[in-house]
Amino acid sequence: MDRTNGTSAPTSKVNRLQATESDNELLELKVNVPDEDKIGFSWRKLWAFTGPGFLMSIAFLDPGNIQADLQSGARYSYQLFWVLFWATFLGLLVQRLSARVGTITGQHMAEICYTEYRPVPRIFLWLMMEVAIIGSDMQEVIGTAISIYLLSSGKVPIWGGVLITVLDTLTFLFLDKYGLRKLELFFAFLITIMAITFGYEFFYDLPDMLQVAEGIVIPKCTDCDTDKISMAIGIIGSCIMPHNLYLHSGLVKTRNVDRSKDRSISEANFYFLVESALALFVSFIINLFVMSVFAEGLYGKTNIDVLNECNARNDPYGPALFHNDTNLVDVDIQSGGVFLGCHFGAAALYIWAVGILAAGQSSTMTGCYAGQFAMEGFLNLTWVRWKRVLFTRSIAIIPSFWVAYYSDISSFNGMNDFLNALMSIQLPFAVLPAIAFSSNTRIVGKFANGVCQKIISLLIFFLIFAANALLVVEFMEAIEKKWVLALIYIYFIIYLIVCIYLLLHCIAALTDPDSSINRNWFMRKWILGKSITDYYDRHHFLENTTSRPILEDTEDIDEIPEEDVVFVY
């Protein structure tokens, strides 16, 4: 209420965020948490909090992940299993940070970015998240189109499957109209399909479990060349997706948590962590199934080896995909499915296609939710869901359709590898905000990260940044056109500037709000956002008015000079 004229003041973006309102349809759906006096672990509470972590884990199981898994197994056998394990573990650590931010504040990360960052870097962050979401959507379009092609025995061409993905996505997006728990149950059903289908391939011809265990536990990189390093970075990029951090911080808002009680917040943080760990353990096992099957079945094999298997079963796809030569097999989602059909029988091909279809559909929906959170938070712009998904899918479908119609499926290999690398490059724009917000006592209060958590989080960031630097150097060495190289140089100069900005902001967030770093004129003028400047202006105002009379509400207000009045809100 405006104190000067008694009229209602317009609701600002900051006020709307503080009121934890949201225009997102998904966040209007809430799950109640049972209020129990029981001390200790509660299965009922775990069940109430189960959902957001499994929706988040979908990003660890999209078609881009599956392709990275099968290529890693086929090319390098069991050597990169440890990369998958540690990528999943690091994913859990950073997802934990984003979930804590949403749980403690009642705001998702994109909303907090609106008040914490300056407009120019904030817009750049939004653009990079849109690039990541669209890149992920392209992988889902490709995977779904290939699965439709395989399930239809080639009757629906891949470019036709690309077009179909627009319609089926719009159909699935209305599922939350039936209730949040049913939506989460549907996602669990899709994950179960992936576990059954990929698990079937794994147990049908069980690989050497000792080698699997060694690959997970013992880090090794025999004959480590740039291709193997790129594959390892691709696995990291396919597991830890930048937009997934923003998604997870929003999904946890679907639980009714009493934020006036520290115990309720602590319980929510604990159960969300347990649920996320369970969900990512399931995703790790599914990815391990795929890696193991192709490490056991395809590593060291040539095209003619696989072609002979296909000819023995009279498989119609084999001759078109595997040439009569002694080159090592270069496998993708389609040729991987065909190999399974030739190796295990036709049923294995269709089972594989169903698993890929489930991966593509589930990832599409979570990508849409992430896009809604990004627009709502970064821009204060809200679209209804069907407009949002059409926007993302329309952009993603153009290059996918072009490649599918005018080229062959092998062209998707290079595109998918590029997209996985793209995800990895965008990671600093999600990891640094997650570290900053979860460590800032001004935002999360007493629940801020401790010293060890801050150090581990920063080490994760520098590890990701170093891996990206290697990837960029290798990528730029392969570019021959000077004008393309010039554009990339310009982009990476901007990229580096924004990373430095985010790092400076993060360093300020790691310190006390009243520290000299936060009070520095350069930081306040160029780095820190509106929320911190408002914080200091408010504290400076109170410090200068402590000796003046303080009034809450009085009819005698006119008797006191205006300059001596301080309202307490």
Tell where the protein language model's regions lie, with residue ranges:
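Transmembrane alpha-helical segments of multi-pass small-molecule transport proteins
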Residues: R122-W126, E130, L151-F174, I193, ...
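Hydrophobic alpha-helical segments and their helix-loop junctions in multi-pass secondary transporters
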Residues: T169, L173, I191-C221, I229-A232, ...
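Terminal cytosolic tails of multi-pass membrane transporters
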Residues: R3, S438-F447, L485-Y569
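C-terminal membrane-solvent junction of multi-pass transporters and transport-like membrane proteins
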Residues: F186, F373, W383-S394, F412-Y495, ...
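Juxtamembrane transmembrane-helix boundary signature
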Residues: A19, M56-S57, V83-Y117, F124-M138, ...
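Hydrophobic, membrane-embedded alpha-helices of multi-pass small-molecule transporters
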Residues: L46-G64, F198-E296, G355-A359
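Loop-to-transmembrane helix boundary motifs in multi-pass membrane proteins
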Residues: V120, P157-T165, H323-V331, G341-I351, ...
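Flexible loop linkers connecting adjacent transmembrane helices
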Residues: K30, A68-A74, Q95-P121, I146-I148, ...
